[in-house]
Regions:
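Short secondary-structure transition/capping segments
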Residues: 13, 69-78, 99-112, 167-170, ...
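Generic detector of well-ordered alpha-helical packing
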Residues: 33-35, 99, 119, 172
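Active-site cofactor/cluster-binding pocket
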Residues: 73-129
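A structured phosphate/pyrophosphate-recognition subdomain
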Residues: 2-30, 40-47, 125-204
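Anionic-ligand anchoring segments at beta-strand to alpha-helix junctions in alpha/beta enzyme folds, i.e.
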Residues: 20-87
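Short secondary-structure boundary/hinge segments and terminal tails
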Residues: 64, 89-91, 165, 185
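Short coil-to-helix leader/linker segments, especially the first N-terminal amphipathic alpha-helix
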Residues: 1-7, 73-78
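General alpha-helical segment detector with a strong preference for membrane-spanning helices
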Residues: 36-38, 102, 122, 175
Length: 204
């Protein structure tokens, strides 16, 4: 496993991952709204491509914050907690989202193939299948961008739109740190449930 600065990331496309029939999407440990939203976006895309896909996280603690448990419940996000990750190696492709496989904030799960989708600076290189865009305010924006590249109809899925909106909202300190035009484009284009966003905000 190579460390910081060993290689420059290229812009991987979701199309490159469609050769896998079984796909596991892993959020970082103790996932926040952005990680959950990003994972949900990828889950919806691969599910609609007919893939056998699951969305999970590991680590010491289950998600317990009221805003996040409400987000998962109200938006129908199939997020599962993996209590014993070493006992269940991943068959097929493992995608880490909003984190990088081998970094300190994500439990390592043995996997045949690995891909990384993240909006943080490069920490660990473990695969050629990487998409890092640290100039974006949220990983939700990166996933939205990748879905746009595939002409995936995000606007038709209000639950997904709500998740992506809330992920950006939380990762940019309630939009106060919003500066990238792509983040702004996503915020303006999403079809989301204002009442649910208010519910999540008020329960945080």
């Amino acid at each position: 496993m190579y460390r910081r600065g060993a290689e420059k990331s290229r812009e991987m496309m979701l199309e490159e991952l469609l050769g896998y029939d079984r796909i596991t999407i892993q959020c970082h440990d103790n996932p926040d709204a952005d990680a959950i939203a990003s994972g949900f976006g990828l889950y919806c895309f691969f599910r609609d491509q007919g893939k056998d896909v699951r969305l999970l996280y590991a680590g010491k603690n289950k998600v317990r914050k009221a805003n996040l448990t409400l987000m998962v419940e109200k938006l129908g996000i199939p997020l599962k907690y993996l209590a014993h990750p070493g006992e269940e190696p991943v068959d097929g492709l493992l995608i880490t989202v909003d984190c990088q496989y081998g970094a300190g904030n994500v439990t390592v799960i043995p996997a045949e193939e690995i891909a990384v989708i993240d909006h943080h600076p490069l920490e660990v290189i473990c695969t050629e299948k990487m998409r890092l865009q640290p100039n974006l305010g949220s990983c939700a924006t990166l996933v939205w961008t990748m879905l746009q590249e595939m002409h995936y109809p995000v606007e038709k899925n209000k639950d997904l739109g709500t998740a992506l909106y809330y992920g950006l909202f939380m990762d940019t300190n309630q939009f106060s740190e919003l500066s990238n035009p792509v983040d702004m484009d996503m915020r303006e284009s999403l079809n989301f449930d204002k009442n649910l966003v208010s519910l999540f905000r008020n329960s945080n």
